Amino acid sequence: EIKEVGSKWKDQFKPGDKFSIQPALNYEGGPAGLLSAPGYSYRYAGGDATYIIIPSDVMEMGCLLHYNGPGFYPASLSEPLACVIGAMHACYHTHPGSYVHQMEIKDGGKMALLAGVGPMGLAMINYVLRREDRKPSLFVVTDIDQARLDRAATLYTKEFAASRGIDLRYVNTGTVENPVETLREISGGTGYDEVIVMAPVPAVVEQGDDIL
């Protein structure tokens, strides 16, 4: 919530306004160049601070956004959800002999989400199942924590996925002898059009590479 507004911006903001900051400023003049981000790069805008001074870079780049939602919690999800949506849109495919990058997931393709039932993974599942413009025909979600897999399966059921035209499978790769072989068998031996890895674990990254 905005507490005070300087004279330069009083025509656009007022005390009591709720707001959200778009953190990807893409501003070369920031303290860390293009990678500068509120919460990390600015002296008076720390991520753990109770009160902050909005950096002038944020204001000049138009990255202080009005928020008119019911509370702070939904607004706090905008950045992680943007990461999920951006990851989907950043997927691309190529064909031998061509340098053309076909952006986006393959409509009707096969997708695997590895280590996929943490908070960001759940957001990814939600987005995949609810997209209107394109969706996979097979969507395999893995983890090694059965309790978290079970919870994901109650939040996003196979029945709901089927109603959206998606064959959703939850797989505990910690209970199978050869996860790569198991996942390739589920794909029908073809591998997956998209593999998204949600944990920076070398073995899981290698799994992802092996099932593409």
Segments the model singles out, each with a brief description of its role:
Residues 122:
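Residues forming the Rossmann-fold NAD(P)(H) cofactor-binding site
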Residues 71, 93-111, 190:
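Short helix-loop-beta connector
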Residues 1-28, 46, 58, 65-67:
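Glycine-rich beta-strand-centered segment in the early N-terminal region that forms part
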Residues 212:
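Helix-to-beta-strand junctions that scaffold the AdoMet/dcAdoMet cofactor pocket
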Residues 43-48, 67-95, 117:
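A glycine-rich, Thr/Ser-enriched phosphate-binding loop motif common to dinucleotide/cofactor-binding enzymes
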Residues 26-36:
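Short, Lys/Arg- and Gly-enriched loop/turn segments at beta-strand edges
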Residues 11-13, 74-80, 104-105:
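Residue-level "contact hotspot" at macromolecular interaction interfaces
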Residues 108-110, 114-117, 125, 129-207:
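Adenosine-nucleotide cofactor-binding segment
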